[in-house]
Amino acid sequence: MISNASTKEERGNYLSLKTMTKYTSEIYTVNATQAQAYERLADLRRFEALKAAFSDPEKMQYILQNLPADQVSPEKLAEIREQVEKMQFTEDTISADTKMGPVSLAIVEREPCKLVKLVTQNSPVNATVWVQLVEKGTYQAALKVTIGVELNFFIRKMVEKHIKKAPDGLAQFLSQILSVG
């Protein structure tokens, strides 16, 4: 017979068991060659240009005009702008202050012209992001994002519907950003 203490311990271990679950985007088109898209993605300092874009009223107006109204409200865009302005970029990391505290995404693997792999640092949630690029045509590349998140069963069930949207949201964003020289 198993004692109550042992049963509670086993239940506690089961509840805290974390597994990596992967979520994958659809395939998106980048209007740049595979090499150009990779070059833009592999050095995260290039994303510093986002700060300038969000600070320029003309570019903000252009962004608002080209976003579907049901995706991002002007208020949400202002919130995003505020977050982007606080971000810090190095060649290998993007750091941001979040509601959970400072969080970073760091490049841990680069496979020239094909893959950039990032992992979270200083985050309460372990996550990995794989961005894959494949030549699609003379001046286009195909882009796919896979996000792996390490969560316990109960937390995963609570946030899964939101996490499932993340790869497509990120892939759509990257396909637009990487298309711009």
Regions found by a protein language model. Give the residues of each.
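Short amphipathic alpha-helical signal-transduction/dimerization elements
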Residues: 45, 163, 167-179
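Hydrophobic ligand-binding cavity/cleft-lining segments
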Residues: 2-88
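Hydrophobic pocket/interface hotspot
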Residues: 37-41, 47, 107, 118, ...
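Beta-strand/loop substructures that line and gate deep hydrophobic ligand-binding cavities in soluble
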Residues: 117-168
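Glycine-rich portal/gate segments that line the openings of hydrophobic small-molecule binding cavities
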Residues: 61-121, 180
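Residues that cap or initiate secondary-structure elements
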Residues: 34-36, 93, 102, 111-113, ...
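Short, surface-exposed coil-to-beta transition loops
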Residues: 23-25, 100-105, 125-130
